[in-house]
Amino acid sequence: KDCKRESNTFPGICITKPPCRKACIREKFTDGHCSKILRRCLCTKPC
C-alpha cells in the first residue's frame, strides 16, 4: 500500500511528472505525480 501526501517543497501548478517526482525524492518519498483535477504535486511511498 502506498501512502500519499502533497509535496511541501513543490512550487506552483504541477504540469509534468519529472519535476514533481524530483521534489518528492528530495522529501524522502519514492515517487511523485500530478493530481488530475487540482494539479498538485502528490508524493508517494510504501507505508
Swiss-Prot record:
Which positions does the site annotation Required for formation of double helix cover? I15, I37
- Positions of a 1,2-diacyl-sn-glycero-3-phosphate 1 binding: K36, R39
Question: Cystine bridges: which residues?
Answer: C3-C47, C14-C34, C20-C41, C24-C43
Q: Outcome of K4E?
A: Unperturbed ability for fibril formation and membrane disrupting activity
Taxon lineage? Eukaryota, Viridiplantae, Streptophyta, Embryophyta, Tracheophyta
Key word Disulfide bond present in the record?
Answer: yes
Q: Name one GO cellular component term.
A: vacuole
Q: What is the recorded function of this protein according to its Swiss-Prot or TrEMBL entry?
A: Plant defense peptide. Disrupts membranes containing phosphatidic acid (PA) via a PA-dependent oligomerization process.
Give the PROSITE patterns listed for this entry.
GAMMA_THIONIN (PS00940)
The name this protein carries in UniProt is Defensin NsD7
Among the GO biological process terms of this entry, one is: killing of cells of another organism
- Mind telling me which Pfam families this protein's record contains? Gamma-thionin
Compartment annotation: Vacuole
InterPro entries per UniProt? Defensin_plant (IPR008176), Scorpion_toxin-like (IPR003614), Scorpion_toxin-like_sf (IPR036574)
